[in-house]
């Protein structure tokens, strides 16, 4: 069941993603504000990352899949969430290889 939620996506003065929120029944997400930086200047996260939220949903569906509610649809949903994580990790690896991970550079 898709519940109602409100989302607010914030931008910095340059138009870059800069945090935001998602709030609904049982949900209260505060997104990462700004880049983490690189090297010695790398900061601790101050908010959630999309990958973490996707993985949290994946583990919950896996919980159902490991119970009497096991079904084909759950298995497919898990696969698709794992695929989403794979693509996001591929993006991060590419950014690492280009030396721009943790920055607003492309």
Identify the residue ranges that each predicted region occupies.
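Long, non-catalytic architectural segments outside compact domain cores
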Residues: 1-49, 104-106
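Short, compact, well-ordered microdomains
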Residues: 64-102
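Residues in flexible loops and secondary-structure boundaries
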Residues: 37-39, 62, 96
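Acidic-enriched, low-complexity/disordered segments with a strong bias for Aspartate over Glutamate
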Residues: 10-14, 55, 66, 96
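Weak global preference for isoleucine
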Residues: 27-29, 54, 61, 76-78
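Short acidic, glycine/tyrosine-flanked loop/strand segments centered on an H-E-D-like triad
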Residues: 46-63
